[in-house]
Amino acid sequence: MFTIDFTDHTGEVNSEWYQQIDNLLTFAKKEEKIEDDAELSVTFVNKQEIQEINRDYRNKDKVTDVISFALEEDEPDIEGLDMPRVLGDIIICADVAKEQAEEYGHSFERELGFLALHGFLHLLGYDHMNEADEKEMFGRQKLILDNYGLTRD
């Protein structure tokens, strides 16, 4: 079973956010052909907390919109254990998501979905450190969002 564990450090999250992200990432999981027995976490934080995480773990002392930590990187495979595949953690700054939705002229729901999917693709190994990787990741991101029906309109 695909499991997403949600945590809210802001006190502002509602169940609709959880459901939207759960539906989108379940759709993306199928699009990416990820096995059903997988899990990840999504945590909502404020600007101060995401800046601290960004500083402490990425050496970037600034606010950002989403950070993901893939738990599979450099992990040895353990054979014979019937355990779910743990993909990692996605951390979303709800305040920045609201600001970016307004700045880009689309709904908060679309921005939230975009950030959750962006973090999810990072957990699967996609990146945008060079032009070719960026083209692949952003193309995949757009295709999944379009197929799901979460457009910029």
UniProtKB/Swiss-Prot annotation:
The lineage of its organism: Bacteria, Bacillati, Bacillota, Bacilli, Bacillales. Its cofactor is Zn(2+). This is Endoribonuclease YbeY. GO terms for cellular component: cytoplasm. Transmembrane segments: none annotated. Single strand-specific metallo-endoribonuclease involved in late-stage 70S ribosome quality control and in maturation of the 3' terminus of the 16S rRNA. Gene3D superfamilies: Metalloproteases ('zincins'), catalytic domain. One of its GO terms (biological process) is rRNA processing. Keywords: Cytoplasm, Endonuclease, Hydrolase, Metal-binding, Nuclease, Ribosome biogenesis, rRNA processing, Zinc. One of its GO terms (molecular function) is RNA endonuclease activity. HAMAP family: Endoribonucl_YbeY. Its main location: cytoplasm. Pfam families: YbeY. Signal peptide: none annotated. It comes from Staphylococcus carnosus (strain TM300). PROSITE patterns: UPF0054.
